[in-house]
Amino acid sequence: MLPEQIERLFEEPPAQYNETHFALFREFKSALNRGEARAAEPDAGSPTGWRVNTWVKKGILLGFRMGAVIDMSVDRARQPFIDKSTYPVRSVTPADGIRIVPGGSSIRDGSFIGRGVVCMPPMFINVGAYVGEGTMIDSHALVGSCAQIGHNCHISAGSQ
């Protein structure tokens, strides 16, 4: 049902967006965070072994359309953060089982980060990314939007 709703919303002009549409987008982003919605996923029936979910890519684009540019800085003088209101930095707690070493790392809301992932600074994980359990994102690595990374991988320093 979520795929069809996102497809319909994608066709709506931004001037028509209302609170129901924003609630749908929040539901979509939550599904991304849980790993239940993926931009691509394994598909044994596909010649490549993968299926691209275009509805997910459309949902991500919707977030950019729906968001206003706002100041989300914690310490504006030291590190300004001005971006779309729909894609803040993801909230992470110890219960998530993710290790984020201090030193300038960011994970954008709308990405799945599996348990046991280690994030070495500085690194960035963008919206729509899926990072499997036990993976290490090493220093100066950029995990792009919609990137699909398996379990127990090492994304080496400087990778993009």
What are these regions (language model features)?
Residues 1-98:
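Terminal amphipathic alpha-helical/low-complexity segments used for targeting or macromolecular assembly
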